[in-house]
Amino acid sequence: GSGMGILLMLVSLALFVIGFTMGGLNYMITVLQARTRGMTLMRMPLTVWGIFTATVLAMLAFPALLVSAIMMTLDKVLGTSFFMPTILKAGEVLEYGGGSPILFQHLFWFFGHPEVYIVALPAFGIVSDLISVHARKNIFGYRMMVWAIVGIGALSFFVWAHHMYVSGMNPWFGFFFATTTLIIAVPTAMKVYNWILTLWRGNIRINTVMLWCLGSVSYTHLRAHETQPY
């Protein structure tokens, strides 16, 4: 892009990542070191587990976004060629050369797919706790739910290139990322069925909160807005 707007966007993006990293460190240290007496990790609310795992993901994923913003800024300001291949402009060969737009895609999606779970995992934790409260039952399989959250977070770093099947990526890499994409469905399904088993024979209060939670369960299971009944 041309003009000052792109440069300001890249600088603001870098500042955002730095600020988020500082806030994420604060949250991680609070969870690990400042819990109340008797509150072990395996007694924490699932909401806290979701936010904590999302924070760890952000601490690992956002630096890739920061690096890509810095590299793009250097391409724009100093004439480097991290992302610019040899191209023609008005019939003349640019000074830039040797870069790869695919590199930008990898850096972006290495951030971009864990970012999906940075958004989703806290919501999963909130839904888990609300279903438990409004079904008046302890959450079914608490430890399983914790490990499902952690497993989803870990696997989220091995599926990013499923956004890049048509980018010219090696087919064997595509096979690997397709396989990991299928595997990540396992802990997600564990969470959904644990929600259903928590609802089973529970003393359910049909109020606004529970209706939203039931909508979340059905949406996570059906994965389609068109089939969302709530």
Task: Give names to the regions the model predicted.
Residues G151, F157-H162, W172-K191:
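Acidic, glycine-rich loop-and-beta core segments that form the ion-binding/anion-interacting portion
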Residues V116-F124, A189:
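Hydrophobic alpha-helical transmembrane segments
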